């Protein structure tokens, strides 16, 4: 009888199972190692991404700060310029409150010239009168006011003093002559408004002061010369192109009238231009005319004291 070798199938199955188990375990270990590597890679990628985001955020903040800084500096510059402009405008508005420096004095001549001129008997150095200057360094402003009737009264008093030979002349007589001519031209339609105004009376006074002589011997002669000056005042200061001669004529001969006109023009042409071009000269003549009334009061006071 032969020997029978029996092989248990469970052993084989166990071996296969063990092998299978070993194989699956090995596969599981390999998969676990791969998963561990993937996890490590994911961790590294996450770790590397977080600092990058922070860097990007920080750099963005820096860029924003750099962009904001020029705007803030620009606003600061604008504010500074506005303050400077405000200060300049305030300083310009307050210029009148500041005192201007006095004008520079001309250099004095050498001592040798002064001594030489003094030894010759008279000094050649003369001090020019200085105009009145205020604290601000500008010439003093003079304001003179007077009505037409007041200036006409002053003109009549001046003519009475100038023509001392005319004993019966009243200060109102020249005023009546002037107003009669002005009214006649208004009624005839040669002018729309009266010519007798303060400025025109000042112009007439300037002419009469240099033209009318103290040697006038009659009222008729004074009236002829006064109306000649009035005609030139109308021609120079009036609004119309021309005026009729009849209201200004006293004598029948027109040649005598035109001769007087030419003599007055030759004598007073420069002053007639100056009184319109120079306001200071006009103010001076205005003041002189207004002071004529004060001179009459002084004269009456002296006559009363003499009596």
UniProtKB/Swiss-Prot annotation:
Compositional bias (Low complexity): 111-124
Result of altering residue 305 to A: In L-3A mutant; abolished recognition and ubiquitination by the CRL2(FEM1B) complex
Residue numbers of Phosphothreonine PTMs: 138
Biased composition (Pro residues): 100-110
Keyword match Transcription: no
A single GO cellular-component term on record: perinuclear region of cytoplasm
N-terminal signal peptide: none
Tissue: Brain and neuron specific.
UniProt KW keywords: Biological rhythms, Cell membrane, Cell projection, Cytoplasm, Lipoprotein, Membrane, Myristate, Nucleus, Phosphoprotein, Ubl conjugation
Region (Disordered): 97-136
GO function terms (MF aspect): actin filament binding; alpha-tubulin binding; beta-tubulin binding; cadherin binding; calcium ion binding; cyclin-dependent protein serine/threonine kinase activator activity; ionotropic glutamate receptor binding; kinase activity
BP GO annotations: axon guidance; axonal fasciculation; brain development; cerebellum development; ephrin receptor signaling pathway; G protein-coupled acetylcholine receptor signaling pathway; G1 to G0 transition involved in cell differentiation; hippocampus development
Coiled-coil ranges (or none): none
Lipidation (N-myristoyl glycine): 2
Post-translational note: The p35 form is proteolytically cleaved by calpain, giving rise to the p25 form. P35 has a 5 to 10 fold shorter half-life compared to p25. The conversion results in deregulation of the CDK5 kinase: p25/CDK5 kinase displays an increased and altered tau phosphorylation in comparison to the p35/CDK5 kinase in vivo.
Residues found modified as Phosphoserine: 8
Positions bearing the site annotation: Cleavage: 98-99
Outcome when changing residue 8 to A: Increased susceptibility to calpain
InterPro entries, alphabetized: CDK5_activator, Cyclin-like_sf
Additional facts recorded: Cleavage of p35 to p25 may be involved in the pathogenesis of cytoskeletal abnormalities and neuronal death in neurodegenerative diseases. The p25 form accumulates in neurons in the brain of patients with Alzheimer disease, but not in normal brain. This accumulation correlates with an increase in CDK5 kinase activity. Application of amyloid beta peptide A-beta(1-42) induced the conversion of p35 to p25 in primary cortical neurons. Expression of the p25/Cdk5 complex in cultured primary neurons induces cytoskeletal disruption, morphological degeneration and apoptosis.
Record-stated family: Belongs to the cyclin-dependent kinase 5 activator family.
Subunit structure: Heterodimer composed of a catalytic subunit CDK5 and a regulatory subunit CDK5R1 (p25) and macromolecular complex composed of at least CDK5, CDK5R1 (p35) and CDK5RAP1 or CDK5RAP2 or CDK5RAP3. Only the heterodimer shows kinase activity. Interacts with EPHA4 and NGEF; may mediate the activation of NGEF by EPHA4. Interacts with RASGRF2. The complex p35/CDK5 interacts with CLOCK.
Role, per record: p35 is a neuron specific activator of CDK5. The complex p35/CDK5 is required for neurite outgrowth and cortical lamination. Involved in dendritic spine morphogenesis by mediating the EFNA1-EPHA4 signaling. Activator of TPKII. The complex p35/CDK5 participates in the regulation of the circadian clock by modulating the function of CLOCK protein: phosphorylates CLOCK at 'Thr-451' and 'Thr-461' and regulates the transcriptional activity of the CLOCK-BMAL1 heterodimer in association with altered stability and subcellular distribution.
Protein name: Cyclin-dependent kinase 5 activator 1
Gene that specifies this protein: CDK5R1
């Amino acid at each position: 009888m032969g020997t029978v070798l029996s092989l248990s199938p469970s052993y084989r199955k166990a071996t296969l199972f063990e092998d299978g188990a070993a194989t699956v375990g090995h596969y599981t270990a390999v998969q676990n190692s791969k998963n561990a590597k993937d996890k490590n890679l994911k961790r590294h990628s996450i770790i590397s991404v977080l600092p990058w985001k922070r860097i990007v955020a920080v750099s963005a903040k820096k860029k924003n700060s750099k962009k904001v800084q020029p705007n803030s500096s620009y606003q600061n510059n604008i504010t500074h310029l506005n303050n400077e402009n405000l200060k300049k405008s305030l300083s310009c508005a307050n210029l009148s409150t500041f005192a201007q420096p006095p004008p520079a004095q001309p250099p004095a001549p050498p001592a040798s010239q002064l001594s030489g001129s003094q030894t010759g008997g008279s000094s050649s150095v003369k001090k020019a009168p200085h105009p009145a200057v205020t604290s601000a360094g500008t010439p003093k402003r003079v304001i003179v006011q007077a009505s037409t009737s007041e200036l006409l009264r002053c003109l009549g008093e001046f003519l009475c003093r100038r023509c001392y030979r005319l004993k019966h002349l009243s200060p109102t007589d020249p005023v009546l002559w002037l107003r009669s001519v002005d009214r006649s031209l208004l009624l005839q339609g040669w002018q729309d408004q009266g010519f007798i105004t303060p400025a025109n009376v000042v112009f007439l006074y300037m002419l009469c002061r240099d033209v009318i002589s103290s040697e006038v011997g009659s009222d008729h002669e004074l009236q002829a010369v006064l109306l000649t000056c009035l005609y030139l005042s109308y021609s120079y200061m009036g609004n119309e192109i021309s005026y009729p001669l009849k209201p200004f004529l006293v004598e029948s001969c027109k040649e005598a009238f035109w001769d007087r006109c030419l003599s007055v023009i030759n004598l007073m042409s420069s002053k007639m231009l100056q009184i319109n071009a120079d306001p200071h000269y006009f103010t001076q003549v205005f003041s002189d005319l207004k002071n004529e009334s004060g001179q009459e009061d002084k004269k009456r006071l002296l006559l009363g004291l003499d009596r």
